[in-house]
Curated annotation (Swiss-Prot):
This is Large ribosomal subunit protein uL4. Residues 31-101 are annotated as: Disordered. There is a cross-link at residue 35 (Glycyl lysine isopeptide (Lys-Gly) (interchain with G-Cter in SUMO1)). Component of the large ribosomal subunit. May bind IPO9 with low affinity. Interacts with RBM3.
Amino acid sequence: LKLNPYAKTMRRNTILRQXRXHKIRMDKAAALKAKSGEKGVPDKKPVVEKKGKKAIGKKAVGVKKQKKPLVGKKAVVTKKPAAEKKPAXKKPTTEEKKAVA
């Protein structure tokens, strides 16, 4: 068995990429908190209270509505690379090589 010489590098890069993405996410969250604090919008605190007391069904509906457009976007994105891959396959070239051999 030949081990992938880049496995260690790939693993390290994956960890570093995840750490970078996490840091960016946390920075964005902190910025949002700072903005909401400056505006003095008390919307988030009542939402926290509602989560514990009621409106669990409302939360689920809101989450579903957010997920559906994302799924649609993913499907569109998935279709485009599939269309690009078909011309790039170059199957006749492989057949020509076999014919030459």
